[in-house]
A protein has these predicted regions:
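N-terminal subdomain of lithium-sensitive/metallo-dependent phosphomonoesterases centered on the IMPase/IPPase/PAP
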Residues: 1-85
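Short, flexible helix/strand-to-coil boundary loops that buttress conserved ligand/catalytic motifs
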Residues: 23, 127, 137
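Short, intrinsically disordered/low-complexity patches at protein termini
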Residues: 43-44, 114-116, 148
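Residue-level detector of flexible, active-site-proximal loop/helix-junction positions
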Residues: 67, 130, 140
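DPxDG-like acidic metal-binding loop motif
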Residues: 73-134
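Secondary-structure transition/turn motif
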Residues: 135-141
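Phosphate/pyrophosphate- and phosphate-bearing ligand-binding catalytic cores of soluble enzymes
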Residues: 141-151
Length: 151
C-alpha cells in the first residue's frame, strides 16, 4: 500500500479518537471570521493530522490551518487537502454525522483519499492509481495499519 495512504489512514484514526474524546465532554464553540463554528475537536484533530502530514514535506491545505496565498498554492504540483472535522455543526449536535477527510492531490487530481467516520468507526480509503477503494468497520480507534489491511 502507498506509504502516504498509510500515513493518512493512521492520522485519520488518531484524529477520530481525539474527536470522540472531545465529543464526550462539555465543549465550547467559537466562531471563525466566516461565522463557521470551531471546537476543540477541530483544533486537536488538525494538530494530530498536521503532525503526521508535515514530515511528508508535502504542502497542506487545511480548513483549520493559516491559509497560504493562492499565488503560492497555484504553483504546488502536489498537496494534501484536509478537513479535520467535516461537519462541525453536526459534531456540535452530537448526531454522529461528521467525518475526518484527508486527500492527496497531484496536478489538480486526487490520487488518494481517506474518510473516517469516528462515531461509527467506518473507514473509507482509496488509491486512484491502483483503482482500488475500500470500506471497513473498525472495532476501536486504536487500530494499527496492519489490522486495517487485514480486514
Amino acid at each position: 500500500m502507498n506509504e502516504n495512504l498509510q500515513i493518512a489512514i493512521v492520522a485519520s484514526l488518531e484524529a477520530g479518537k481525539a474527536i470522540m474524546q472531545v465529543c464526550n465532554t462539555a465543549f465550547d464553540v467559537e466562531y471563525k471570521d466566516d461565522k463557521s463554528p470551531l471546537t476543540e475537536a477541530d483544533k486537536r484533530a488538525n494538530d494530530i493530522i498536521n503532525s503526521y502530514l508535515i514530515p511528508t514535506l508535502i504542502p497542506i491545505i487545511s480548513e483549520e490551518n493559516k491559509q497560504i496565498d493562492y499565488d503560492v498554492r497555484k504553483n504546488w504540483k502536489t498537496c494534501w487537502i484536509v478537513d479535520p472535522v467535516d461537519g462541525t455543526k453536526e459534531f456540535i449536535k452530537r448526531n454522529g454525522e461528521f467525518t475526518v477527510n484527508i486527500a492527496l492531490v497531484t496536478d489538480d487530481k486526487p490520487i488518494l483519499g481517506v474518510i473516517y467516520v469516528p462515531a461509527t468507526k467506518f473507514l473509507y480509503f482509496a488509491d486512484v492509481n491502483l483503482k482500488k477503494a475500500y470500506k471497513t468497520e473498525l472495532d476501536v480507534h486504536d487500530t494499527t495499519i496492519k489490522e486495517v489491511l487485514a480486514k
